[in-house]
Amino acid sequence: MKRTIVTLAVVFMALTVSAQEWAPVGDNIKTSWAESLDPSAPLPEYPRPQMVRSAWMNLNGLWNYAVTEASSESFVPEGKILVPFALESSLSGVGRRFTRDNALWYEREFTVPRSWKGKNVILHFGAVDWMAEVYVNNVLIGEHKGGYDPFSFDVTPALKKSGKQTLKVKVQDATDNSFQPRGKQCIINAGIWYTPVTGIWQTVWMEPVSSAYVKNYYAVSDIDKGEIAFEVDARTADGDVVK
């Protein structure tokens, strides 16, 4: 009974801390989903329903953040941001504008489950607008350009054998001051132009895989023949791509 009471107390304290560190910004009209948002577990749904693996970890939630000069290679956290909501949005808890002269930094810690030992760990981003540099334990894992497509990295080589791991993401977004695809986003939004979307705006998550695994698949149907052809994108133990 004592153990149960202590556990419930810890959970309650964690939820209280989350509520104190985050609140929607501004007086924007909210949907029922926004009204009931839990900052300790935003968007908890499995992010890839067409190819489900039972083991995975959702990294959404409160991260440290800072806005620095674009050329900066380091940062000092200035507050909390709720991932996966864009910097400019109310639900991020920040509601701040961004320019091409800025860099947006994210930081959080995570622990790899013991049950993942011997597996490769894949880090997934549903979308980050626009250019992202990803670091694990201060090791640059990879870069991605594009605000609308998902991307992933095998972070296994950068992981420590045990204990807390550190994940950092540096984002730059020029919006309409560059060539990048942006829809109707505009830094000076008025009329038909929308407020920009900067930073992580889709689920961040990890999963363990074997050294050889299926990364993706594509299905093409032939109605006349009554057939479906599958193209499988796989990775071998040697790192080769097989299709």
Predicted segment positions?
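Accessory beta-strand-rich segments of carbohydrate-active enzymes
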Residues: N64-T68, R96-R97, D101-N216, A237
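Hydrophobic h-region of N-terminal signal peptides that target proteins for export
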Residues: V10-S18
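Beta-strand-rich binding/interaction modules
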Residues: V136, G226-K243
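Predominantly extracellular/luminal regions of secreted and cell-surface proteins
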Residues: G61-P84
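Sec-dependent signal peptide recognition
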Residues: K2-L8
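N-terminal pre-domain segments of enzymes
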Residues: Q20-W56
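Beta-strand acidic-aromatic groove motif in beta-rich domains, primarily in extracellular
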Residues: S72-F75, Q180, V241-K243
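Short, solvent-exposed loop/linker segments at the N-terminal edge
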Residues: V220-G226
